[in-house]
Structures are given as C-alpha cells and as structure tokens.
C-alpha cells in the first residue's frame, strides 16, 4: 500500500536515526517491544511492500520473543537465536499507548497456531504482522492496529509473477486488496517509535 511522500520521508529519517543509534543495546529491550527484521536484499515480500522490512516479532520476556514463522507457526524463540539469524538486522519498535503486559498475554493465546502462508484472515492460522495486529491493545483493551488492504503488486502496480504463481498453485486468485497487515507498514504507524538497532 503506497504511503504519502511526507510519511515516507519521516519513516526514512526514523530508520536512519535508529540504525545510527549506538546506545540501543539488548538491555534496553522491553517486554512488549516489537522487533522489525530489516533485510539487506529485496525479496518477494519487500518487493510488494514499502521498505525493506519482511518480518516482525514480539519481545515476550527478557531473552525471548514470540513470533509467527513459516513451517513452525506461532512459537517462542530465544532472543539470541533471533539475533544470530544471518540476513539483515532488527530494529526495536516501541508501541506507544500499549498495555504491554496484556498485549503479550494476548499473543500467547495464539501459541501453537499454524503459520498462515496464504495471508488470509482465517482463525486457524496466523502470520507475523497479523499476530501483532490481533494482540496489541491499549489500557482499555481496545485494538491498536487496524488492517489495511493487502498489496501483492510492485511499484508499477503490477501483481508480481511470484505471487501469481504462488496463489495459482493453491487454486486461488491473488487476494489483492483483502484486509490484512504487513510488517513494513506496521513499522511506519504513528504509534510506533523506533528505538534503535538490536545488538
């Protein structure tokens, strides 16, 4: 989903400042913070979403995250394992106005759910940014993240060959415009404050 130029500029500035932040060490990571995975090379997800972020995880304990990942579904992962993944790095995002404890508890309700590789709003499987969207609430229990129209097209507006083939194998049309989320767009929401790079 395309963003306004001013929003893109603000996000780029935030991204640069976060990447340059030298004081943002692991001990500053709080329960309820989000970890956005920034890749070094474009892939089939970043090709159709704004920015180079292709995954998001939730800090669920001092040295642990909860995340939805392909083949495994919603799982708990040691923080060191996350940090040691080869490609790219992680940015810490703090959700302003969130009830962090309750939001993490909500995420735990999805533990063991399958991974939604089709990126559809189904109750029996879930993908990474959908976990965040469904789990995060404010102090009054109100959801903090709404959905957006899903995008499977590139900058020219053309649905990419990858996604055409992917959904064709499942006997489906590409769910362009269906309600959903993506990690890159989530990172640009006004209620997300990028705190720096996970080290």
Region spans (language model):
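Activation targets extended, charge/polar-rich intrinsically disordered C-terminal tails
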Residues: 123-199
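Glycine-rich catalytic cores of cysteine/serine-nucleophile enzymes that process amide/ester linkages
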Residues: 29-30, 34-94, 114-126
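Bacterial N-terminal signal peptides that target proteins for export
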Residues: 2-13
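Gram-negative bacterial Sec-dependent N-terminal signal peptides
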Residues: 16-17
């Amino acid at each position: 989903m395309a963003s306004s130029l001013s929003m893109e500029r603000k996000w780029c500035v935030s991204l640069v400042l976060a990447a340059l932040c030298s004081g943002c060490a692991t001990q500053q990571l709080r329960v309820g913070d989000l970890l956005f995975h920034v890749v070094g090379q474009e892939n089939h997800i970043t090709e159709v979403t704004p920015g180079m972020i292709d995954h998001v995880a939730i800090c669920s304990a001092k040295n642990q995250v909860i995340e939805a990942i392909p083949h495994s579904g919603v799982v708990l992962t040691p923080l060191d394992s996350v940090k040691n993944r080869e490609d790219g790095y992680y940015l810490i995002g703090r959700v302003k106005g969130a009830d962090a404890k309750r939001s993490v508890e909500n995420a735990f309700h999805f533990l063991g759910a399958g991974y939604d590789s089709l990126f559809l709003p189904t109750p029996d499987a879930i993908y990474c940014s959908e976990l965040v969207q469904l789990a995060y609430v404010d102090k009054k229990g109100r959801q903090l993240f709404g959905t957006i129209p899903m995008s499977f097209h590139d900058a020219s507006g053309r649905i990419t060959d990858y996604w055409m083939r992917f959904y064709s194998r499942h006997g489906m049309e590409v769910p362009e415009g269906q309600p959903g989320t993506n990690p890159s767009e989530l990172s640009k929401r006004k209620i997300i404050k990028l705190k720096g790079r996970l080290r």
